[in-house]
Amino acid sequence: MHCERFLCVLRIIGTTLFGVSLLLGITAAYIVGYQFIQTDNYYFSFGLYGAFLASHLIIQSLFAFLEHRKMKKSLETPIKLNKTVALCIAAYQEDPDYLRKCLQSVKRLTYPGIKVVMVIDGNSDDDLYMMDIFSEVMGRDKSVTYIWKNNFHERGPGETEESHKESSQHVTQLVLSNKSICIMQKWGGKREVMYTAFRALGRSVDYVQVCDSDTMLDPASSVEMVKVLEEDPMVGGVGGDVQILNKYDSWISFLSSVRYWMAFNIERACQSYFGCVQCISGPLGMYRNSLLHEFVEDWYNQEFMGNQCSFGDDRHLTNRVLSLGYATKYTARSKCLTETPIEYLRWLNQQTRWSKSYFREWLYNAMWFHKHHLWMTYEAVITGFFPFFLIATVIQLFYRGKIWNILLFLLTVQLVGLIKSSFASCLRGNIVMVFMSLYSVLYMSSLLPAKMFAIATINKAGWGTSGRKTIVVNFIGLIPVSVWFTILLGGVIFTIYKESKKPFSESKQTVLIVGTLIYACYWVVLLTLYVVLINKCGRRKKGQQYDMVLDV
């Protein structure tokens, strides 16, 4: 016992020193600005900080590639499908078409004897359509529905403590005794909905799969995640490959689709290699039920800065698994399609909410670095502090008073984006990933200020995005973007003022003209490809129905 505690203390000290040293090293490299290569007049330079970031991308891509090779080898491993699985679907003001597609895909799941529990967040007349769709798709004679005035933590109007207890027991009994059930309950947020499913199931099943009501599951999705959990008893949770269902509906949903592929098949695949996936996404994830019930109460009652948390449910669920020392994995063999916002403002609000949960969970996650591979500490430091270094770099370049610095920054952003997207195109075997380089502009212009706004408002709760049946536009997300554009515009004006005081040399004019032409050509080529290959092909494809969720 004493030896274990001593080793634990050593690991805590070691990971802390490693993380602090890494951060100090990156900061020193950034401040010193040592250059390996630089041209006359500093038109181009490549320094220590840039070399570090380039190395990170290469190493991350390498481990992602190795993890994908391991996934392919696992196909040869036979397993017995004798473990019990329950699928929990969280629904809130869902678009009827998406919900119907979700439930139809659930009926096609190939895992034998899977139990389906759908919990609707809200029990008003306006929510009844979701229960009707459930009965229609799952079969009125094969499913059970129940309208609950309460939820496990709040009583409905006219309910007593005794009647609340009785109704809670009734809900639990309904879930345990039926293979397919839909419950409408008093509104309480997504975490309340998930808690109802977990609590009612108890320890009656081996694995619990989670799913959102806008998700289309691949028939083999459950089987593939069970394989991962069966192969290693120290894996506590696993997530699958989440792709975009409505990627051709707008430019924002299309760019989100290529970003999703990169996030799952590069970033999370790399994390999976070391057994420390930091977020098992809500549309497609599976957990060991025995672990789930070790922390479900603490997970539900999570507080931050004195307020109960009502977002970041999936990320905190993942962190709870990691806190117990169990690994979390990703498998590209399990797939699904899910809805993403098609309007810029709704997308911005979604990203702000996700950023809030990321930074909040970063602090919680840091307490368990010592229980996992050093890669978990390394990546947390890199991804957690990168936005701050990036903002400092942008402001510095925009206020140096040189037009070339601004142009070089724009060119560098697209060059890095092209390099990453080219590798992704090779790994995926699909040229469409080249459009990932366009997402870098969206990141710099919108996601970066949204992250800062998320930190400033991190204790503000709420769903963040509205239900899909009725889209509510929230303009609050434009505030940080407007402030950011004002800062950048100020830098451009300052630079023009400084440059206007002295004539351009012939070499400087040549460099600026060539750089501008390259940047303009990049946009002309990419936008032309988007219009020709995506818009036209998309109109034909987005109306198709898929029996299998394929990488299309």
From Swiss-Prot:
Broad class of enzyme this protein falls into: transferase
- Record: glycosylation sites: 221
The EC number(s) given in the record are 2.4.1.212
| Annotated pathway | Glycan biosynthesis; hyaluronan biosynthesis
Single GO molecular function: hyaluronan synthase activity
- UniProt topological domain (Cytoplasmic) ranges: 1-11, 67-374, 424-429, 497-510
Query: Which keywords fit this entry according to its UniProt record?
Result: Cell membrane, Endoplasmic reticulum, Glycoprotein, Glycosyltransferase, Golgi apparatus, Isopeptide bond, Lysosome, Membrane, Phosphoprotein, Transferase, Transmembrane, Transmembrane helix, Ubl conjugation
Q: Give a short account of what the protein does.
A: Catalyzes the addition of GlcNAc or GlcUA monosaccharides to the nascent hyaluronan polymer. Therefore, it is essential to hyaluronan synthesis a major component of most extracellular matrices that has a structural role in tissues architectures and regulates cell adhesion, migration and differentiation. This is one of three isoenzymes responsible for cellular hyaluronan synthesis and it is particularly responsible for the synthesis of high molecular mass hyaluronan.
Which PANTHER family does the entry link to?
HYALURONAN SYNTHASE, HYALURONAN SYNTHASE 2
Q: What is this protein called?
A: Hyaluronan synthase 2
Q: Which organism is it from?
A: Rattus norvegicus
Question: What is the phylogenetic placement of the source species in the record?
Answer: Eukaryota, Metazoa, Chordata, Craniata, Vertebrata
